[in-house]
Amino acid sequence: VLHAPRVQVYSRHPAENGKQNFINCYVSGFHPPQIEVELLKNGKKIDNVEMSDLSFSKDWTFYLLVHAAFTPNDSDEYSCRVSHITLSEPKIVKWDPNK
């Protein structure tokens, strides 16, 4: 059974320009477990990301958290790109600092 991933992008703390924070990409509800998750800054892959261990929920779908340190400002755009067998093309979700 195939399940497409849900993707949520959020900062650990309320965003303040010039103040260091962590950006999180939480990917959940997917199956099979093979997945590629990348954090992007202005469309370019962020290299120094940390990834949680792949875990599964009671319904046997998987979830994963990818995060990186970042310092928000008005000019940079952050997003999360997810590739999975259920997606015809990678899913890109932008971070909204006002959420």
Curated annotation (Swiss-Prot):
Role description: Component of the class I major histocompatibility complex (MHC). Involved in the presentation of peptide antigens to the immune system.
Family annotation (InterPro entries): B2Microglobulin (IPR015707), Ig-like_dom (IPR007110), Ig-like_dom_sf (IPR036179), Ig-like_fold (IPR013783), Ig/MHC_CS (IPR003006), Ig_C1-set (IPR003597), MHC/Immunoglobulin (IPR050160)
PANTHER family: BETA-2-MICROGLOBULIN, MHC CLASS II-RELATED
Subunit structure: Heterodimer of an alpha chain and a beta chain. Beta-2-microglobulin is the beta-chain of major histocompatibility complex class I molecules.
Intrachain S-S bonds: C25-C80
Protein keywords: Disulfide bond, Immunity, Immunoglobulin domain, MHC I, Secreted
Family per record: Belongs to the beta-2-microglobulin family.
Gene3D superfamilies named among the record's database cross-references: Immunoglobulins
Compartmental location: Secreted
Pfam families referenced in this protein's UniProt entry, alphabetically: C1-set
Gene encoding the protein: B2M
Entry annotated with the keyword Secreted: yes
Domain Ig-like C1-type: 5-93
One BP annotation, GO: antigen processing and presentation of peptide antigen via MHC class I
Protein name listed in UniProt: Beta-2-microglobulin
Main subcellular location: secreted
